[in-house]
Design a protein with these regions (language model features):
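C-terminal (or distal) subdomains of carbohydrate-active enzymes
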Residues: 1-308
Length: 308
């Protein structure tokens, strides 16, 4: 059972339920909306939404388009008409797998990484959308599962949950990682096309702009975020909660010269990724990434978002 209810600060509510009589229905509606195969793929006034779910999700605030073989084709902020989706490896809702093969030995290969998170000969693989499943469609939310073919995994899917009457999207990556001795990482892009926004995270309870509000000469490649990240603008801002994965990577998805922090504003405009899995640091992390995992996120719009 799902429903929406608004609460004032410190307000308490008691909910109860009771059996309701079944709603009356017409045996014959004279409306063609579903065929004998029980597939609702007919455009009709009776059901305007179900026939479109294999291609897109939409509410008052967002439009998400997707196509098998093409992946995510659109992530639209409807109020402004702005396309939030970025290209290449920054495409939202699309998982990435990166692998550096062991060509010497496991320790020497990791030493040669230096400050980079991948080797000079690393390869990055982007998930390819191969199937779409409608899990739930109701008056409160709709859930759609996007199945991706992703190197290094036996299963990879992203479940989108869009609320009908809230400016909020929840999304979950489900992954079955295969066994490999290579240096590996799994990412989910969190970059949005908001060039005027400032990117904030909370680190140690303190809001900061990565690449700007940190010590000169310090690392800018990866960060630990207490709760997630915020794209802050003068009006409406976008909050992304990284509920299960505090590690973020910022920068190009390739081996590159390392620039230490010089506090320039441009540092805050770099691509950002949720760094879900890695076995880069063998002293701190599990070397074997194989197994099943589920990692949840939530994106929502906020008006005049403060930093505390």
């Amino acid at each position: 059972m799902s429903f929406l209810s608004e609460f004032e600060p410190l307000e308490e509510k008691l909910f109860s339920y009771e059996e309701q009589p079944a709603p009356s229905g017409k045996l014959y509606t004279r409306t063609a909306y579903v065929g004998a195969e029980r597939v609702r793929d007919i455009v009709s006034e009776y059901d305007k939404e179900t026939c479109r779910l294999p291609y897109c999700l939409e509410n008052e605030w967002f439009f998400i388009g997707y196509r098998i073989g093409e992946g995510i084709t659109s992530f639209l902020h409807k109020k402004s008409g702005r396309q939030l989706l970025k290209n290449g490896t920054e495409a939202f809702f699309t998982p990435l797998y990166e692998r550096t093969e062991i060509r010497r030995d496991v320790y020497e290969e990791r030493r040669l990484l230096g400050r980079n998170i991948c080797g000079l000969h690393a390869r990055c693989f982007q998930g390819t959308l191969q199937d779409i499943r409608i899990l739930e469609h109701g008056p409160v939310f709709t859930r759609v599962e996007l199945d991706f073919q992703l190197e290094g995994t036996a299963h990879s899917s992203v479940i989108l949950k869009m609320y009908r009457h809230l400016p909020k999207i929840e999304f979950t990556l489900r992954i079955a990682k295969t066994l490999s001795e290579a240096i590996e990482s799994v990412y989910l892009p969190l970059s949005l096309h908001l060039p005027e926004a400032e990117l904030y995270i909370k680190n140690g309870g303190v809001p900061m702009r990565p690449g700007v509000d940190q010590l000169p000469g310090s690392n800018m490649e990866y960060y630990i975020a207490d709760e997630g990240l915020l794209y802050r603008t003068d009006g409406e801002s976008v909050l992304i909660n990284t509920l299960d994965t505090p590690l973020l990577y910022m920068g190009p998805m390739e081996h590159h010269p390392i620039v230490l922090c010089d506090n320039r504003e441009i540092n805050n405009k770099r691509p950002v990724y949720s760094w879900i899995m890695n076995n880069t640091w063998e002293t701190n992390f599990k070397m074997d990434l194989s197994g099943f995992g589920e990692f949840s996120y939530a994106l929502e719009l906020r008006e005049n978002t403060g930093l505390h």
